[in-house]
Design a protein with these regions (language model features):
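Conserved beta-hairpin
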Residues: 48-65
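C-terminal "cap" of GNAT-fold acetyltransferases
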Residues: 149-167
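Short beta-strand micro-motifs in enzyme catalytic cores
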Residues: 50-52, 84, 158-162
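Conserved active-site alpha-helix within GNAT-family acetyltransferase domains
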Residues: 128-148
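Conserved acyl-donor/pantetheine-binding loop and adjacent beta-alpha core of acyl/acetyltransferases
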Residues: 62-90
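Conserved GNAT acetyl-CoA-binding A-motif
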Residues: 114-128
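Short amphipathic alpha-helix that is part of the acyltransferase structural core
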Residues: 2-39, 55-58
């Protein structure tokens, strides 16, 4: 029997933005997440419905409510179709920390926060091209279902849109 592992989720200080180690973690995976400069990262943290980390830079999650001041084609896709939602903008786990349940712990906390804020669903996009099979499997295991598809020529990606009902 495997013992449950607990992680301390730490809310980011909205006045400080992303600490340098988290910014570096994000930018290490810029192809999947998109590159962030310190100013853009600070704006995202201020606007987020949930901005949290595990450890100094073990994992990061940023998610936005539908009324956030956030310009992003994927976020806009959801805003045009759903009334109330939490949009997962980015989640990243440091390579050395993968497979330990950090992403699942972040999502579990997000689902609880979304329910507490009376949101009906949590949404996200997953790259189809370039493919991200690990993300596909992870989101399927959490009950996400595909609700749309888009080609993003400026980003050089094709994405699928997913939703998970809350409550």
């Amino acid at each position: 029997m495997t013992a449950a592992v607990k992680f301390l989720l730490i809310d980011l200080n909205r006045d400080e933005g992303l600490p340098p180690p988290l910014l570096a973690l994000n930018n290490e995976f810029a192809q999947e997440l998109s590159y962030l400069c310190p100013e853009k990262a600070a704006h995202l943290v201020r606007e987020a419905a949930m901005a949290c980390r595990v450890g100094e830079a073990d994992a990061l999650l940023l998610a936005f409510a539908q009324d956030a001041a956030y310009e992003n084609p994927n976020f806009e896709w959801f805003r045009g179709r759903f009334e109330r939602f939490i949009y997962i903008d980015r989640v990243v786990v440091a390579p050395a920390m993968r497979g330990r349940g950090l992403a699942r712990a972040l999502y579990t906390a997000l689902f609880s926060r979304a329910e507490a804020l009376n949101h009906s669903q949590v949404v996200c996009e997953i790259n189809l091209d370039p493919p991200n099979p690990a993300s596909d499997a992870f989101h399927a295991s959490l009950g996400f279902e595909q609700v749309g598809l888009a080609v993003l020529p400026r980003a050089g990606k094709t994405v699928r849109y997913f939703s998970r009902k809350i409550g």
